[in-house]
Amino acid sequence: VSAFDWNKSGDKIAYIRFDETNVPEFSMDIMGEELYPTEQVFKYPKAGEENAKVSLHIYDLASDTSSNVAISSFNNYYIPRIKWTEENYLLSVQLMNRHQNELDLILVDASNNNSTLLLHKEKDAAYVDVNDDLTFLKNNSFIWSSEKSGWNHLYVYDKNGKNEKQLTNGEWEVTGYYGFDEKSGLIFYNSTQNGSINRDVYSVSIQGTNNKRLTTETGTNNASFSSDFSYFINTFSSSITPYVFTLNEAKTGKITREIKNNTTLSNKLKDYNMSPKEYSTISINGNDLNMYTIKPLDFDETKKYPLFMYQYSGPGSQQVANRWGGGNDYWHQMLAQEGYIIVCVDPRGTGLKGRDFKKMTQKELRKYEVEDQIAAAQALGARD
């Protein structure tokens, strides 16, 4: 995240200034190579304490002057993002209240440094997620993402923030926004349309039609597009396939070249008799929770096995995903070889299953997550 932004012609730079004078200090002992720790003191506003005073400024190269932007109607605010529009004199500013449950997108006229228009407003009973999806088109209409429907989706608005059109729709999440190609009129994004444990690259027209899946392998796909949106490099993996990198045509998704694969690793792992991850759901407290299970290779359903449950349940996180794992996977394989069943359950509060599922832990962290883990353990323990 950058606290400054140049306008399109490069003659003005907007920047954010932070005044921490009245922010209380926090000290921390740093344990190093010396016999005694060193003390680090830094500004740290705890809940209820005074925040840094944030101000917005614009520097003009031609006049070599910096001036303050008047945002008089907002007090005790955050400025999470600033971004120039297609007009050299119009700056977009995102403002949030301290509770972070309201976000205002406003326009600032750099000719007089006053906020001129409330372009868009987001409200949420819990909190508003901030991202970098905002994109201004040549006519200053803009693309925006929101959870207002209960799921994270893409919208387009005219230059006055009116005439809303929802571009993506359904009980699935847009998990990444890659950008808009003016030539083809296509928007490229990543989503869970193929199931909440999977990710694919898609395109949709600026009219919200012709939604098209561009990746074909089921698992986790992520794209990096060329600047002209002609091609993208796709990174694919699944629970059984290490990372594969390909060059794809943006319009069709067709693979034009395989850049790198992990065939050598895949062949080597065959010698280790790895137990597969089995993906499923488990009904807990009225919700179908995503779950994966790793069993011993010689699993016998007539026998009882010790159960090891692994989890991380931070807000919006995901552990049960169809992707190539890290170090924990090998640890879990070792446990399976020792006769354990390993289970991971994504409880309420984790991500990719809608706004309500993710944000229900607001102000109640450790309640629903723990309840679901306990209930899942009890349900699994009661199985024959």
Predicted stretch roles:
Residues 3-12, 81-91, 133-141, 178-185, ...:
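Blade-terminus and WD-like Trp-Asp/Gly-His loop motifs, strongest in beta-propeller folds
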Residues 67-71, 117-124, 163-168, 210-215:
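A short beta-strand motif characteristic of beta-propeller blades
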Residues 60-64, 110-113, 158-162, 205-209, ...:
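Short loop/turn segments that connect beta-strands within beta-propeller blades
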Residues 1-6, 12-68, 251-267, 319-329:
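Predominantly five- to eight-bladed beta-propeller fold
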Residues 67, 72-75, 79-97:
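Long hydrophobic segments that form regular secondary structure
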Residues 1, 16-53, 73-76, 95-106, ...:
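A flexible loop/linker signature enriched in serine peptidases of the S9 family
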